[in-house]
UniProtKB/Swiss-Prot annotation:
CDD domains: enolase. The lineage of its organism: Bacteria, Pseudomonadati, Acidobacteriota, Terriglobia, Bryobacterales. Keywords: Cytoplasm, Glycolysis, Lyase, Magnesium, Metal-binding, Secreted. Its cofactor is Mg(2+). GO terms for biological process: glycolytic process. It comes from Solibacter usitatus (strain Ellin6076). Catalyzes the reversible conversion of 2-phosphoglycerate (2-PG) into phosphoenolpyruvate (PEP). It is essential for the degradation of carbohydrates via glycolysis. One of its GO terms (cellular component) is cell surface. It catalyses: (2R)-2-phosphoglycerate = phosphoenolpyruvate + H2O. It is an enzyme of class 4 (lyase). SUPFAM superfamilies: Enolase C-terminal domain-like (SSF51604), Enolase N-terminal domain-like (SSF54826). Binds a second Mg(2+) ion via substrate during catalysis. This is Enolase. InterPro entries: Enolase, Enolase-like_C_sf, Enolase-like_N, Enolase_C, Enolase_CS, Enolase_N.
Length: 427
């Protein structure tokens, strides 16, 4: 019996020591699913609303007791007796119960925790791995990891404007080999930075956060580490960037406030990226190269470099089918970043990914900077055959647990496991 008999929500802590929400869903046959919700530091304006208590006397206003209360009250009552295998019905019931366009009444964090926990409970009831339950017999593609090795922007207190510099070991023959390659680059980068006298303290996502002199020094340090680790930039290990441009878009200008204070118009920002793509041919992907509502700038960027590299919309699309449809119709970007907590239910996440695939857009399943020990997104990446995952560096257990889950899945799939390599970026 996959009937829901009990739902329980609680407040726990994320990887930054901030409160977040966890939910347990119990079924009539004794099966149980548990899921915890991540939280972002650089959040898009159009994301579903994360409910916080606002009590400054407790966790500096970031408590999640009200979200947990909603789970234990309204949500538990509404879902009692429903079939956990009917994910669309479960998620639809919570959306209707909330009654707002952005899940702001009950909280997207409350709704998502229950949504994911329900899927886990249903998978447990069927004695099926989560990736297989969600994706069926065709779920066999392991993702190329985007490993964040230098942090800047809102993720680190340093002089780097661009938020993430990542390596993607696409030249590997398997996920486990790709992970090894990325880890070796990460450890080599530590030596490169130490030799130059830089700190090797890490940021929120486990990448290093040194006080580099410029954004150029950051990417060049990554390239140096790739080479010193014995790999070839652009041939078997690529560079992926997440500038998180909305974070430095002020008054209609892109302002590099952390480094040289330079300002750029949208046209100049596009030219900046075009120059980087020419100068650094190892660049495979740029995420949020333009601000979330700079649609004209995004269109120009897509027309300028979209045929050469992957252009990922994160704050632009916020895993939202409505915004993604607008982008597809306008010829903007060619890839979507998938963050389950941006939209707030598993059903809507899967709908956005399907829409992207139908339009020939790639998809990158992603963590948030405030993570938990829940490896749900590892299973999601395999379930959807996304081919790419972005889940931090080779440090911090909140990041490593996703990689370890992917290793387990690859082992379980055996000879049927597929590693897409460079094909992951094909459209």
């Amino acid at each position: 019996m996959t009937t829901i008999v009990r739902i329980f929500g609680r407040e726990i802590l994320d990887s930054r020591g901030n409160p977040t929400v966890e939910a347990d869903v119990y079924l009539a046959d004794g099966s149980m699913g548990r899921a915890a919700v991540p939280s972002g530091a650089s959040t898009g304006e159009h994301e579903a609303v994360e409910l916080r208590d606002g009590d400054k006397g407790r966790y500096l206003g970031k408590g999640c007791l009200n979200a947990a209360k909603h789970i234990n009250g309204e949500i538990a009552t509404a879902l009692h007796g429903k079939d956990a295998t009917q994910q669309g019905e479960i998620d639809g019931a919570m959306i209707a119960l909330d009654g707002t366009p952005n899940k702001g009444r009950l909280g997207a964090n409350a709704i998502l925790a229950v949504s994911m926990a329900t899927a886990r409970a249903a998978a447990a009831a069927q004695r099926t791995p989560l990736y297989r339950y969600l994706g069926g017999v065709g779920a066999n593609t392991l993702p190329v990891p985007m490993m964040n090795i230098i942090n800047g922007g809102a993720h680190a207190d340093n002089s780097v404007d661009l938020q993430e510099f990542m390596v993607a070991p696409f030249g590997a023959k398997s996920f486990s080999e790709a992970l090894r390659m990325g880890v070796e680059v990460f450890h080599t980068l530590k030596k490169v930075l130490s030799k130059k006298g830089y700190s090797t303290a890490v940021g929120d996502e486990g990448g290093f956060a040194p006080m580099l002199k410029s954004n150029e020094e950051a990417i060049e340090s990554c390239l140096e580490a790739i080479t010193q680790a014995g790999f070839k930039p652009g041939e078997n290990v690529g560079i992926c960037l997440d500038p998180a441009s909305s974070e430095f878009f002020k008054g209609g200008k892109y302002v590099f406030k952390k480094s040289d204070k330079s300002e750029r118009t949208s046209e100049q920002m596009v030219e900046f990226w075009a120059n980087w793509v020419r100068q650094y041919p190892a660049i495979l992907s740029i995420e949020d190269g333009m601000a979330e509502d700079d649609w004209a700038g995004w269109k120009l960027l897509t027309d300028t470099v979209g045929s050469k590299i992957q252009l990922v919309g994160d704050d632009l699309f916020v895993t939202n089918s409505t915004r993604l449809k607008q982008g597809i119709e306008g010829g903007v970007a060619n890839s979507i970043l998938v963050k389950v907590n941006q939209i707030g239910t598993l059903t809507e996440t899967l709908e956005a990914m399907q829409m992207a695939a139908n339009a020939g857009y790639t998809a990158v399943v992603s963590h948030r900077s405030g993570e938990t020990e829940d490896p749900f997104i590892a299973d999601l990446a395999v379930a959807t055959n996304a081919g790419q995952i972005k889940t931090g560096s080779a440090s911090r257990t909140d990041r490593i647990c996703k990689y370890n889950q992917l290793l387990r899945i690859e082992e379980r799939l055996g000879s049927s496991a597929v590693f897409p390599g460079r094909k992951a970026y094909s459209r």
